[in-house]
């Protein structure tokens, strides 16, 4: 590595550390650590063993963030000092490069910790695709998104499973529900929630005109046993139907598909992936609990927005990302302004750049 490259790398590292410091709010972090430490010195702290363990775990996590930041700061300062001494002693160059590599590794892991630090980021994810109005063209767009997310999941080590599939009238899909099982599935895929817009020459239009289509993507964390969402049996209507795979393959001769309707909210979920009615009901119930939990979180967020006077409409005009196939090729995220011209690669599941840009934008916003 040339000296000029080393200098540039040190400048970039200092900028990253400044960003980390701003995101962490070190003064607040120190106060939280002191508060929890004081709680743990109380004589009756261990009377409630479960609460005590939770507090202890929270303290360890906060201390871990705090200590790692200061370790990075010390390593950065040491790297700067070695650079100053390099003019007098060339033999320090190897040690300097090793320090930079070590700092890069720590910073990368630390950045991911900060980016995926919200509740349920580490949970599995449930993702739904719903094409908008536009008939076959819109339903085909939904199918292209299904392919994109399936390829993304497979390429990134997630177990991807189709929970429910409703085929389109001529092509594509009317709706699909997927599960992504693996570390940080929800934390990564939450960036995809919103309206996705397609512009292309429709293969279903004999006049070869340009069409604009929309599809909405919903993403929810799969809830584990530590999160309780009460669903009363009296509030649920269950219907059964014959289920089949994508495109109508393997259609069952018995009604194993399950559709649950939550009467108070009107939320409808269905599962067709399991071979048994019991299995599909269990999966559908988990999906319903996730939707009810998300609904409650959205209500809380709306209350906060109302207090702030922040009104944000969710409409087809508020798309989060546009995919332009013609007259030029471009995929652009309208929240982060991150864009790529290689639309084919994006549709093959290479959306990591959009996800990274979104997570960093969330921290800076």
Swiss-Prot record:
One of its GO terms (cellular component) is cytoplasm. It is found in: Cytoplasm. Methylated by PrmC. Methylation increases the termination efficiency of RF2. The modification N5-methylglutamine is found at residue 249. SMART domains: PCRF. One of its GO terms (molecular function) is translation release factor activity, codon specific. It comes from the Bacteria. Keywords: Cytoplasm, Methylation, Protein biosynthesis. It holds the Pfam family RF-1. Transmembrane segments: none annotated. PANTHER family: CLASS I PEPTIDE CHAIN RELEASE FACTOR, PEPTIDE CHAIN RELEASE FACTOR 2. Peptide chain release factor 2 directs the termination of translation in response to the peptide chain termination codons UGA and UAA. Belongs to the prokaryotic/mitochondrial release factor family. This is Peptide chain release factor 2. It comes from Streptococcus agalactiae serotype Ia (strain ATCC 27591 / A909 / CDC SS700). The gene is prfB.
